[in-house]
A protein has these predicted regions:
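Serine-esterase "nucleophile elbow" of acetyl-processing enzymes
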Residues: 1-75, 88-96
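Structural recognition of the beta-strand scaffold that forms the well-ordered cores
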Residues: 18-23, 27, 55-61, 100-105, ...
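Surface-exposed cleft-lining segments at the edges of enzyme active sites
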Residues: 29-33, 75-78, 110-119
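Catalytic His-Asp segment of secreted/periplasmic serine-dependent ester chemistry enzymes
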Residues: 66, 72-78, 86, 110-111, ...
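Hydrophobic multi-pass inner-membrane translocation pores used for secretion
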Residues: 99, 103-104, 119, 161
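Charged helix-capping and loop-helix junction motifs
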Residues: 118-126
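Surface-exposed amphipathic alpha-helices with a cationic face
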Residues: 126-137
């Protein structure tokens, strides 16, 4: 058997903000620079430090992960995207020390050819997860991030009009439902309103210089995403509705 480091729990001064980035490959950093630490959570961490905030940013993104599916996941029947958000919530969020804020970017894989969920099912999944977080970690601020476009992606599982329609419905929910204490509009940052696709400058893959897949942003895309996050929203007092 193999042993892997799962996490490092560190002593920190009282009041240190702990921000969890929860999501799929676009949080994990697919298409960023290999060993470059230029994913959007890395960008956020550096911005916080530069602004004088001693904060911890924890990346719990998993490539291929979904909010609701697949329902049949089990250790005996594993799935490349791992257990869904609800199933891994205890391990990857609730059990962490000192969490003050969570940024949740997820849903595109639920609508891919690897997922069968409707927009309404993902919305309900988000409601359930947010409810569990509030019950276990009262006072934690939960930020919803709009899902970036995958329209016309060359990725085998993504790119369809149906996927994009569901994504838009989910984003409308994230922006307007009031479920979240704040909203980060990554969709607006990464998407080209003229084409509905990812902005062309965010497409070429950062490590190999390849064509990219119109699903995963490159280093420039992650930089723009990380720079778009309102630090005051993350660190200020908890709001009762999205903004």
């Amino acid at each position: 058997s193999w042993y892997f480091l799962d996490a490092i729990d560190m002593m920190a001064p009282a009041g240190t903000p702990v921000i969890v980035a929860f999501g799929d490959s676009i949080t994990d950093g697919t298409a960023s620079t290999l060993n470059g630490d230029d994913r959007w959570p890395n960008v956020l961490s550096r911005r916080l430090a530069a602004a004088g905030h001693r904060a911890a940013v924890i990346n719990t993104g998993i490539g291929g992960n979904q909010v609701t599916g697949p329902a049949e996941y089990s250790p005996q029947k594993p799935f490349a995207g791992g257990p869904n958000a609800a199933m891994r919530l205890e391990r990857d969020v609730l059990s962490l020390s000192g969490v003050t804020t969570l940024i949740w970017l997820e849903g595109i894989n639920d609508f891919s050819r690897n997922g069968t969920a409707s927009a309404e099912q993902v919305q309900q999944g988000m409601k359930d997860v947010v409810g569990r977080i509030h019950a276990k970690l009262p006072g934690v601020k939960i930020i919803g991030a709009t899902v970036t476009t995958a329209l016309n992606s060359t990725n085998a599982a993504s790119g369809s009009l149906d996927q994009d329609a569901k994504r838009k419905a989910l984003n409308a929910f994230i922006r307007t439902s009031g479920l979240f204490d704040g909203v980060v509009d990554f969709d607006k940052v990464a998407g080209d309103p003229a084409t509905g696709e990812m902005k062309v400058e965010f497409v070429p893959e950062s490590t190999t210089g390849g064509a990219g897949d119109k699903l995963h942003p490159n280093r420039a895309g992650y930089l723009a995403m990380g720079n778009s996050i309102d630090l005051d929203m993350l660190l200020g007092k908890k709001k009762s509705a999205s903004r």
